[in-house]
C-alpha cells in the first residue's frame, strides 16, 4: 500500500512538473553558454603571504572571465590600490613625472588578477566613502589634470610607461555611482554635469592613443534618468562610449532582467545600438541598507542573509536567467569582501558555490547551451548545457522548498549535487530517483531549506 501511494505521489509531482514545463531536451541547442560570471575585484592581496589563507587558487578554479575593480582598497585594508588618489596621492604634483606615482601595490594586484585567468576592467575613480566628511571623492576642479593622470595610468599598464607593462587591458570605466555624493561629492550638487565633463575629459585621450580599448560608464545606482542624460551627452558631443553599466541590488531576478532590457532599449533609442550593456555591481540585496553601517545588531543578521542559501540560489538564478537577456557583462559584488563575499572562513559559501556550479555548466564558454525555459513566476530557473560528452542541468528553486521532477530527453542522469542550507553542493545519493521508461528524474527537496539548487550530471544518449 505504501509503495503504491509513493508511486502515485511521484506520478502526481511528475504531471505537475511537466505542466510547468520542466523538460530538458538535449537535442535542442541554443548557441553557447554565455560567461556572465564576472566579478568585482579579485583574490585579496592582504592575506596572500601564507598559502592556507591565500584566495588565489580558489579564484583561479572559478574560471572568472573578467574582474572589474571597485572598492579594491576597501577590500584590502591598508593597501594603496587602484584608486586614482592612491596611485597619484598628491594632485598638485607633475603628472608627467613617474616619481609622483605609486604603482607597485596596484601592479601586484593587476598581475594577481591576470594569474587567475581573468581579464581586467580597470576603473578610473575612487572607492566609496561612508564617513560624515568627504576626502578622496570630492570632484576635481581641474579636469584636464585629472585626465593627464588617467592617461598616464593607462600608459603604465598598456604601453610600459614608468617601468610598466604591456598588458593590453581593454576595458576602462570612469568612476562609480556618480549620482551619489558618497562617491562623487560635488559641493554645488551638479553631479550629472560634473560626471559628464569628467568622463569626456578622461576618455577622449584614452581612445585617441589606445583606440582598441573599450571605455564606458556611468555605473549609476539604478537612476535611469541619470543614465539616459549621460548617454545623450555622449551622443550630442560625439564622446566615445563602448559600454553602459548600472548597479542593481534587487531580491528578484526579474527586476534585474527588466533593468537590462530597459537599458538596451534606451541605448538603441538614443543612438548607441553597438554599445554593450552590463551590470557593474549586482548581489542579492539587503532588506535595509542602513542596517549594514548603523545598526550592529541588525548588521549581523543582514550579513547572514547576504551570504545565505536564498542569496546563493538567487545568484545561480541570475546566471541562468540572464542568458536570455541583452546583458553582455555582469559583475558580482564582491567575492573577496567579508559582508558581500564568497567565503565562510576558508570555504565557499552559497554564493561562491553558485559560481562554482555555473563554472561546471559553462566550461569556459565552450559548452553548448540547451534551450530550456524558466518560470520566474514560480521561482524556478533552469539552465542546461552539454560538453565533453556530458549533459548538465542546473535547476534553481528560488524561495520554494518543494520537490521537482525533470523530464530528460536524450540523456541519463549519473549524479546529482545539491545546494541548500545543509548540503554545500555535495552529491546526494538517496534524494533522487530516475525512471528510465518515461525519462523522469525526481529531485527530493531538503526538509528545512527556504531555497535549493540542483546540479545534475548526465550521460548523453
Predicted feature locations:
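Carbohydrate-binding surface patches
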Residues: 375-412, 417-422, 448-456, 460-461
Amino acid at each position: 500500500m505504501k509503495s503504491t501511494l509513493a508511486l502515485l505521489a511521484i506520478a502526481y509531482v511528475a504531471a505537475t512538473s511537466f505542466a510547468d514545463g520542466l523538460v530538458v531536451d538535449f537535442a535542442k541547442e541554443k548557441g553557447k553558454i554565455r560567461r556572465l560570471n564576472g566579478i568585482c575585484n579579485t583574490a585579496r592581496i592582504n592575506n596572500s603571504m601564507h598559502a592556507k589563507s591565500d584566495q588565489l587558487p580558489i579564484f583561479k578554479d572559478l574560471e572568472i572571465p573578467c574582474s572589474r575593480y571597485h572598492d579594491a582598497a576597501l577590500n584590502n585594508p591598508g593597501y594603496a590600490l587602484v584608486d586614482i588618489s592612491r596611485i597619484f596621492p598628491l594632485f598638485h604634483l607633475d603628472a608627467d613625472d613617474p616619481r609622483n606615482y605609486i604603482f607597485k601595490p596596484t601592479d601586484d594586484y593587476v598581475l594577481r588578477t591576470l594569474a587567475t585567468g581573468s581579464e581586467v576592467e580597470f576603473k578610473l575613480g575612487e572607492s566609496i566613502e561612508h564617513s560624515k566628511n568627504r576626502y578622496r571623492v570630492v570632484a576635481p576642479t581641474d579636469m584636464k589634470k585629472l585626465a593627464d593622470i588617467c592617461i598616464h595610468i593607462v600608459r603604465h599598464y598598456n604601453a610600459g610607461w614608468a617601468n610598466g607593462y604591456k598588458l593590453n587591458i581593454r576595458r576602462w570605466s570612469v568612476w562609480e555611482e556618480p549620482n551619489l555624493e558618497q562617491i562623487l561629492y560635488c559641493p554645488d550638487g551638479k553631479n550629472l554635469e560634473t560626471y559628464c565633463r569628467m568622463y569626456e575629459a578622461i576618455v577622449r585621450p584614452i581612445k585617441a592613443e589606445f583606440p582598441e580599448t573599450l571605455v564606458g560608464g556611468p555605473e549609476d545606482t539604478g537612476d535611469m534618468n541619470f543614465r539616459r542624460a549621460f548617454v545623450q551627452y555622449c551622443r550630442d558631443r560625439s564622446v566615445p562610449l563602448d559600454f553602459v553599466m548600472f548597479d542593481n541590488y534587487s531580491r528578484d531576478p526579474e527586476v534585474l532582467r527588466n533593468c537590462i532590457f530597459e537599458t538596451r532599449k534606451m541605448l538603441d533609442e538614443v543612438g548607441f545600438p553597438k554599445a554593450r550593456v552590463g551590470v557593474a555591481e549586482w548581489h542579492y540585496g539587503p532588506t535595509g541598507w542602513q542596517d549594514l553601517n548603523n545598526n550592529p545588531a541588525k548588521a549581523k543578521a543582514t550579513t547572514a542573509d547576504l551570504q545565505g542559501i536564498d542569496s546563493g540560489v538567487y545568484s545561480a538564478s541570475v546566471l541562468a536567467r540572464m542568458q536570455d537577456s541583452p546583458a553582455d557583462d555582469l559583475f558580482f559584488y564582491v567575492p573577496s569582501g567579508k559582508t558581500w563575499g564568497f567565503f565562510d572562513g576558508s570555504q565557499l559559501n552559497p554564493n561562491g558555490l553558485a559560481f562554482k556550479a555555473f563554472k561546471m555548466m559553462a566550461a569556459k564558454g565552450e559548452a553548448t547551451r540547451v534551450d530550456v525555459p524558466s518560470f520566474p513566476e514560480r521561482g524556478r530557473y533552469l539552465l542546461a548545457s552539454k560538453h565533453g560528452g556530458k549533459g548538465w542541468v542546473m535547476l534553481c528553486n528560488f524561495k520554494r522548498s518543494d520537490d521537482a521532477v525533470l523530464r530528460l530527453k536524450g540523456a541519463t542522469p549519473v549524479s546529482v549535487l545539491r545546494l541548500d542550507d545543509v548540503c554545500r553542493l555535495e552529491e546526494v545519493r538517496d534524494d533522487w530517483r530516475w525512471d528510465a521508461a518515461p525519462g523522469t528524474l525526481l529531485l527530493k527537496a531538503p526538509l528545512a531549506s527556504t531555497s535549493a539548487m540542483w546540479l545534475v550530471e548526465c550521460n548523453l544518449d
